[in-house]
């Protein structure tokens, strides 16, 4: 019973030679070649003419079946990528060329919905030097596709590079003359001009123009930012830099209340230029000059208290006084009894010899209602002192014990 089973089993097994040496399935005509990842088909002009077009015209085997055979002038350029064998951004084709007129040599450039127009001059294709000189083997022509009918077509971004053979190599593919007349009658003229030309098709993108536009807009934004920065006066940052570099108590006194709602700034006495103070010998010199000008201005009334309101020509009323931390406000502001002598004014500030810091000390007030006013800022012209005397102070503090004499 075992013999029939064994015989039947052996009969069902195929011969061993049927499993070996099976040929691979034939590749479909026009299918893309199997290239390793990273490889691109991007030959030079010489390689296209010598290794592909010349062999195609001579009916010799090509290195690889990668260029499709398509009559380009029967399609629009945006239909060609689907008919290409290989390519991502540029596509290669073998295409015939026909005559525009039966008795002429001009090629027909008309397509389905437009036409190809030549641009520039023909570029000769030279083979590599094998002996003396280089041999001209082909010509390259650039064309642009236009929608519509000539000469008022709409230019597109589709570009064609057409390669054709020249010289002896073009004898088998080009028919430059019309067919001869035989038997007293003209035979039907053939419109075929070239059996094969090699064409490269690609679409020109506007990435370069977009990159230039983005760069220009970026530069315009940078210029706008620079203009906005330069619009601010440089003395604002100079004053802050001077305060950090020298550690001057005089500058710290100005910036002590920057975070508060009411900044310590005397309206009418301090200008924007005076806020940006720079510590150093130059600032001390301006402060000494301001002290001398103040003393000379108050010299006629040095023996008697000087009334700021009587010197005012406009009779302006002092604005409402505001409280600041660290400063004492007089109780007699409501009655407008601001008075001080020149000697008291001269003893309000002490400038250190050879130093770069101005120390303002808060000391007890002398003699009742006399108030010492420290004029902050550098430099202060005599006109600014006179304007301050006639317009009044918005903030007044009691500071004494500082020598105004240079």
UniProtKB/Swiss-Prot annotation:
GO terms of biological process kind: regulation of DNA-templated transcription; system development
Chief site of localization: nucleus
All copies of domain NAC, residue ranges: 35-204
Note: High grain protein content (GPC) is a desirable trait in breadmaking and pasta wheat varieties because of its positive effects on quality and nutritional value while Low GPC is a desirable trait for barley malt and beer production.
Record key words, sorted: DNA-binding, Nucleus, Transcription, Transcription regulation
Function as written in the Swiss-Prot or TrEMBL entry: Transcription factor of the NAC family associated with the grain protein content (GPC). Sequences of the 11 European varieties of H.vulgare tested belongs to the same haplotype while the sequence found in H.spontaneum, an ancestor of the cultivated H.vulgare which has a higher GPC, belongs to an other haplotype.
The protein's name: NAC transcription factor NAM-B1
DNA-binding region(s), residue ranges: 137-210
Domains: entry comment: The NAC domain includes a DNA-binding domain and a dimerization domain.
Highest rank taxon of the organism: Eukaryota
Annotated region described as Disordered, given as residue ranges: 1-40
GO molecular function list: DNA binding
PROSITE patterns: NAC
Record localization: Nucleus
Biased composition (Polar residues): 1-11
GO annotations of cellular component type: nucleus
């Amino acid at each position: 019973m075992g013999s029939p089973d064994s015989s039947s089993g052996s009969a069902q097994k195929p011969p061993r030679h049927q499993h070996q040496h099976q040929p691979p399935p034939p590749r479909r005509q026009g299918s893309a070649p199997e290239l390793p990842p990273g490889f691109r088909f991007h030959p030079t002009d010489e390689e296209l003419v010598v290794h592909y077009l010349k062999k195609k015209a001579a009916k010799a085997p090509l290195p690889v079946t990668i260029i499709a055979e398509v009559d380009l002038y029967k399609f629009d350029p945006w239909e060609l990528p689907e008919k290409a064998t290989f390519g991502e951004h540029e596509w290669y084709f073998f295409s015939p060329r026909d005559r525009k007129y039966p008795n002429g040599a001009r090629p027909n450039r008309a397509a389905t919905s437009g036409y190809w127009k030549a641009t520039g001059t023909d570029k000769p294709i030279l083979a590599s030097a094998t002996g003396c000189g280089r041999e001209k083997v082909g010509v390259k022509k650039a064309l642009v596709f236009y929608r519509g009918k000539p000469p008022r077509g709409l230019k597109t971004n589709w570009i064609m590079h057409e390669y054709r053979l020249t010289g002896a190599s073009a004898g088998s593919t080009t028919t430059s003359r019309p067919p001869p007349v035989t038997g007293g009658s003209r035979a039907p003229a053939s419109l075929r001009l070239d059996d094969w030309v090699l064409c490269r098709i690609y679409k020109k993108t506007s990435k370069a123009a977009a990159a230039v536009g983005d760069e220009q807009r970026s530069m315009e934004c940078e210029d706008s930012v620079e203009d906005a920065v330069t619009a601010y006066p440089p003395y604002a940052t100079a004053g802050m830099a001077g305060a950090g570099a020298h550690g001057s108590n005089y500058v710290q006194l100005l910036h002590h209340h920057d975070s508060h709602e009411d900044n310590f700034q005397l309206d009418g006495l301090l200008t924007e230029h005076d806020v940006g103070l720079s510590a150093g010998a130059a600032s001390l010199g301006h402060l000494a000059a301001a002290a001398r000008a103040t003393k000379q201005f108050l010299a006629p009334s040095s023996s008697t208290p000087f009334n700021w309101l009587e010197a005012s020509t406009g009779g302006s009323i002092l604005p409402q006084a505001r409280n600041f931390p660290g400063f004492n406000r007089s109780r007699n502001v409501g009655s407008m009894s601001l008075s001080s002598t020149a000697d008291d004014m001269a003893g309000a500030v002490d400038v250190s010899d050879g130093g770069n810091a101005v120390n303002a000390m808060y000391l007890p007030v002398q003699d009742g209602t006399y108030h010492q006013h420290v004029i902050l800022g550098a430099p202060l012209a005599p006109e600014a002192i006179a304007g301050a005397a006639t317009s009044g102070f918005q903030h007044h503090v009691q500071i004494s014990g500082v020598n105004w004499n240079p």
